[in-house]
Amino acid sequence: MSEPNPKAFPLADAALTQQILDIVQQATHLRQLKKGANEATKTLNRGISEFIIMAADAEPIEILLHLPLLCEDKNVPYIFVPSKVALGRACGVSRPVISASVTSNDASQLKDQIIQMKDKIERLLI
């Protein structure tokens, strides 16, 4: 695999990537996940996004670089994972996914895990 794009900041390490993809997989089963850059943008605009995951190997990376700006405006944490193929698998689809949004649901059993993950991502953004 090639070097990740330097514009992809903050990039999750291997352990954090695994945790993120686990949460993404669980969120998929609970219908708390939106896949793709367009749907991620919609969740941000509607204010229902908990955090945004983007693939660092998106080609060209510029197709999702509007998301970090929007995330900062809306105060939503965001993170890059190394592989769009792995993100696609975690999302439960057979195609690569370059961006995903975990959405909020107060009654969800994922709530505690989502809060912990948001804290970890926010620490990387400092």
Curated annotation (Swiss-Prot):
<dbReference type="GO" id="GO:0000452">
    <property type="term" value="P:snoRNA guided rRNA 2'-O-methylation"/>
</dbReference>
<keyword id="KW-0747">Spliceosome</keyword>
<dbReference type="GO" id="GO:0000462">
    <property type="term" value="P:maturation of SSU-rRNA from tricistronic rRNA transcript (SSU-rRNA, 5.8S rRNA, LSU-rRNA)"/>
</dbReference>
<dbReference type="InterPro" id="IPR002415">
    <property type="entry name" value="H/ACA_rnp_Nhp2-like"/>
</dbReference>
<keyword id="KW-0508">mRNA splicing</keyword>
<keyword id="KW-0687">Ribonucleoprotein</keyword>
<comment type="function">
    <text>Common component of the spliceosome and rRNA processing machinery. In association with the spliceosomal U4/U6.U5 tri-snRNP particle, required for splicing of pre-mRNA. In association with box C/D snoRNPs, required for processing of pre-ribosomal RNA (rRNA) and site-specific 2'-O-methylation of substrate RNAs. Essential for the accumulation and stability of U4 snRNA, U6 snRNA, and box C/D snoRNAs.</text>
</comment>
<dbReference type="GO" id="GO:0046540">
    <property type="term" value="C:U4/U6 x U5 tri-snRNP complex"/>
</dbReference>
<dbReference type="InterPro" id="IPR029064">
    <property type="entry name" value="Ribosomal_eL30-like_sf"/>
</dbReference>
<comment type="subunit">
    <text>Component of the U3 snoRNP particle. Binds to the C'/D and B/C motifs in U3 snoRNA. Component of the 25S U4/U6.U5 tri-snRNP particle, a subcomplex of the spliceosome. Binds to the 5' stem-loop of U4 snRNA.</text>
</comment>
<dbReference type="GO" id="GO:0071011">
    <property type="term" value="C:precatalytic spliceosome"/>
</dbReference>
<dbReference type="InterPro" id="IPR004037">
    <property type="entry name" value="Ribosomal_eL8-like_CS"/>
</dbReference>
<dbReference type="InterPro" id="IPR018492">
    <property type="entry name" value="Ribosomal_eL8/Nhp2"/>
</dbReference>
<dbReference type="InterPro" id="IPR050257">
    <property type="entry name" value="eL8/uL1-like"/>
</dbReference>
<dbReference type="GO" id="GO:0030621">
    <property type="term" value="F:U4 snRNA binding"/>
</dbReference>
<protein>
    <recommendedName>
        <fullName>13 kDa ribonucleoprotein-associated protein</fullName>
    </recommendedName>
</protein>
<dbReference type="GO" id="GO:0000398">
    <property type="term" value="P:mRNA splicing, via spliceosome"/>
</dbReference>
<keyword id="KW-0694">RNA-binding</keyword>
<dbReference type="GO" id="GO:0034511">
    <property type="term" value="F:U3 snoRNA binding"/>
</dbReference>
<keyword id="KW-0539">Nucleus</keyword>
<dbReference type="GO" id="GO:0031428">
    <property type="term" value="C:box C/D methylation guide snoRNP complex"/>
</dbReference>
<dbReference type="GO" id="GO:0005730">
    <property type="term" value="C:nucleolus"/>
</dbReference>
<dbReference type="InterPro" id="IPR004038">
    <property type="entry name" value="Ribosomal_eL8/eL30/eS12/Gad45"/>
</dbReference>
<dbReference type="GO" id="GO:0000494">
    <property type="term" value="P:box C/D sno(s)RNA 3'-end processing"/>
</dbReference>
<comment type="similarity">
    <text>Belongs to the eukaryotic ribosomal protein eL8 family.</text>
</comment>
<dbReference type="GO" id="GO:0030490">
    <property type="term" value="P:maturation of SSU-rRNA"/>
</dbReference>
<dbReference type="Pfam" id="PF01248">
    <property type="entry name" value="Ribosomal_L7Ae"/>
</dbReference>
<keyword id="KW-0507">mRNA processing</keyword>
<dbReference type="GO" id="GO:0003723">
    <property type="term" value="F:RNA binding"/>
</dbReference>
<keyword id="KW-0690">Ribosome biogenesis</keyword>
<dbReference type="GO" id="GO:0032040">
    <property type="term" value="C:small-subunit processome"/>
</dbReference>
<keyword id="KW-0698">rRNA processing</keyword>
